[in-house]
Amino acid sequence: MKKILSVISSARGKASNSIRLQQEIIDKLQARYPESTVTVRDLVAQKYPHLEESHLTAFYVQEENDSPEYRLARTHSEQAIREIEEADILVIGVPIYNFSIPSALKAWIDHIVRSRKTFTVVDGRPEGLVKNKKVYLAVASGGVFSDGPYKSWDFAEPYLRHILGFIGLTDITVFRAEGFSVPGVQDVALQKGIESVAV
């Protein structure tokens, strides 16, 4: 049995192409692992706060100085990290907004990248602590960024590969549905993305 964590970051709800692509990945995973369970974390419906001073202080406070206030400030972070630790597979929906990821997804990432929780430093080098998990990214975009003249404009995939790899999530597969704003491509963009899914 596999535990799947589905992380939604699109603000478009039922009209979201990243969610549709994400669901195709999940459907394929459930067909492969019939007894799998899916936990859905919708970062738009259940917002993670952008980091403030209270969060940063709570993340780095020494154990002897911890307090109920600091523990409260860590609530979202602890929840997000626990969900990742319990999952075998992560399926993350990534609509590209302004060449990068949605702020809702960035806020979630800021809560999961934690010293002594998801990464540590050994001999001066960072080491990820979240290991042995598979990650699928369901990327949707109006432009075509996987190849061609605008490939360098995509800051979403390189960033996600780097930051997730930083905490140990290095087994990453990307599926794309792209070109929704490109004449001649937009009508087949979603279907082409769905047909590319293989897990």
Language model features with spans:
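Glycine-rich phosphate/pyrophosphate-binding loop and the adjoining helix
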Residues: 27, 147-199
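Cofactor-binding loop segments of dinucleotide-utilizing enzymes, especially the Rossmann-like FAD-
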Residues: 9, 140, 177
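Short, well-ordered alpha-helix to beta-strand connector turns
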Residues: 87-88, 132-133, 169
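Short histidine/acidic/glycine/proline-rich micro-motifs that form metal-
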Residues: 11-13, 143-144, 180-182
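Hydrophobic/aromatic beta-strand patches that form the interior of the parallel beta-sheet core
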Residues: 5, 39-41, 136-138, 173-175
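Short, glycine-/small-residue-rich phosphate/pyrophosphate-handling segment
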Residues: 121-166
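N-terminal beta1-alpha1-beta2 submodule of the flavodoxin-like/Rossmannoid cofactor-binding fold
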Residues: 1-94, 101-110, 114, 195-199
